[in-house]
């Protein structure tokens, strides 16, 4: 078996011989993003608000008011896209659920044509609340929290449902978030039971306002939160990360880097910068992506650049001249459209790209570094990445190494030696590249860097 290690050349096309290029991956996903309809999203949020309250403990049988009516409407809207649609439910009780209550998520699946078990999931929570998390009778419009994320999920399904992708996309409206992230846990457990290879969970929670409660406005950026050292397997991973690195290289952190780079590469219509926030979530707050992390899946949270706390978890009221409550008139639908466009571009790209490989880097007491990885089924091209240990993002080197199998299939293990590059000074990673140019997120060659649930190695025999 032969494989070639190449250096990417800097190529210049002669103007005299130039021909119109075929659309590249950036052009294709940008065109998908352009289909996002701001007016349609506003109508979606208006409909969600019309249910009065979507509190998890509200009526499940009333046809016009409560969580049950909202879930049934969402299910009908998903079915209109032609996708396989169903509810995943489980009973729950807890600190904010005093009696056992049925918690349901509405799920729509767009099955992949080549790799149906490789899955990217977009989520938003459909339930809402007021000041008292146990009050399920007052109106809780939940326009931004999280009608905005729910609208993004539905709009993504409307835009992408008629396209075909190698991998699978799952669209989900989750319940029970405000009562304790129950909907996220239910879907993460379902994904585990189905043995999905979840490449990414893109959780959208509060993505529809651009001005904060202090008057500061920022409509040019979206925050993406990602965990550092991965939670799963931390007891086994901790000493290995301490020795070999990986504090900043969880799959979720690399998913965040991927999203930031994607926003740059795609450009208009995605006119937002990704502000990478390197912690799992905001101080003292939580979101459904955490339950995907607990299950071992890469997950990030999208949320606005500046939050307005007067409009979150508040009874509708006017107090001391200040208006409180999460109503639709406080939203910025132009901003929501931009965040949704980034999500659509990311879903299309991730469902088109192969999953990242699992890699390791070695080079102790050597002036060279050896990077080894297991090839992904059906993928013959891989890119080696490096960055300084104190650098934020992977270096965009023009001479980055590319490994391509010259015969099919690739051997069970691929390896390349980076001459004169000392392992101590760098973090290394590997990405997979499809035949049509879609590159996966980078998987860091560190303990816990693989895009899969972590399994501790067996104990060493003395």
Task: State each model region's role.
Residues 19-65, 311, 319-320, 324:
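N-terminal capping segment at the start of a domain
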Residues 43-111:
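A non-catalytic alpha/beta surface segment that caps or lines the substrate-entry region
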Residues 49, 207-225, 276-354:
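Active-site-adjacent mobile loop/cap segments within catalytic or ligand-binding domains
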Residues 108, 122, 127-128, 132-181, ...:
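Alpha-helical metal-binding/catalytic segments enriched in His/Glu/Asp
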Residues 174-287, 295, 299:
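Metal-dependent peptidase/peptidase-like ectodomains
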Residues 367-379:
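Conserved aromatic anchor
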Residues 416-440:
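Beta-strand-rich modules
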Residues 433-462:
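Extracellular fibronectin type III
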């Amino acid at each position: 078996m032969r494989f070639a290690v190449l250096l990417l050349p800097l190529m210049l096309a002669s103007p005299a011989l130039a021909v119109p290029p075929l659309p590249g991956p950036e052009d294709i996903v940008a065109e998908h993003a352009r289909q996002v309809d701001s007016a349609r999203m506003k109508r979606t949020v208006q409909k969600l608000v019309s249910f009065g309250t979507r509190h998890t403990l509200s009526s499940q049988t009333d046809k016009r008011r409560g969580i049950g009516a909202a879930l049934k409407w969402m299910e009908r809207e998903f079915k209109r896209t032609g996708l396989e649609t169903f509810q995943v439910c489980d009973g729950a009780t807890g600190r904010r659920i005093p009696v056992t209550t049925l918690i349901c998520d509405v799920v729509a699946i767009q099955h992949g044509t080549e790799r149906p078990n490789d899955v990217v999931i977009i989520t938003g929570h459909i339930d809402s609340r007021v000041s008292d998390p146990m009050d399920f009778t007052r109106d809780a419009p939940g326009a931004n929290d999280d009608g905005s994320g729910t609208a993004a999920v539905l709009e993504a399904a409307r835009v992408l449902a008629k396209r075909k992708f190698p991998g699978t996309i799952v669209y989900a409206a989750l319940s029970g978030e405000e009562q304790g992230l129950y909907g996220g846990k239910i879907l993460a457990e379902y994904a585990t039971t189905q043995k999905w290879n979840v490449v990414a969970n893109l959780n959208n929670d509060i993505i529809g306002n651009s001005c904060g409660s202090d008057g500061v406005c920022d409509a040019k950026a979206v925050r993406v939160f990602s965990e550092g050292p991965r939670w799963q397997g931390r007891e086994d991973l901790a000493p290995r990360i301490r020795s070999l690195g990986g504090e900043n290289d969880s799959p979720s952190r690399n998913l965040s880097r991927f999203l930031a780079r994607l926003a740059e590469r795609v450009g208009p219509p995605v006119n937002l910068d990704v502000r990478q926030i390197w912690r799992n979530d905001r101080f003292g707050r939580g979101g459904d992506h955490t339950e995907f992390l607990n299950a071992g899946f890469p997950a990030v949270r999208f949320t606005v650049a500046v939050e307005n706390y007067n409009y979150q978890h508040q009874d509708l009221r006017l107090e001391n001249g200040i208006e409180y409550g999460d109503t639709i008139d406080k939203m910025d639908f132009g901003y929501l459209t931009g965040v949704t466009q980034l999500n659509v571009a990311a879903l299309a790209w991730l469902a088109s790209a192969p999953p990242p490989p699992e890699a390791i880097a070695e080079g102790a007491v050597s002036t060279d570094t050896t990077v080894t990885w297991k090839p992904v089924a059906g993928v013959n091209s891989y890119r080696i990445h490096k960055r300084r240990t104190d650098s934020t993002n992977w270096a965009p080197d023009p001479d980055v190494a590319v490994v391509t199998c010259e015969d099919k299939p690739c051997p069970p293990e691929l390896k390349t030696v980076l001459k004169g590059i000392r392992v101590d000074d760098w973090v290394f990673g590997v990405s997979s590249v499809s035949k049509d140019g879609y590159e996966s997120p980078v998987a860091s060659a560190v303990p816990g860097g693989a895009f899969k649930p972590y399994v501790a190695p067996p104990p060493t025999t003395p």
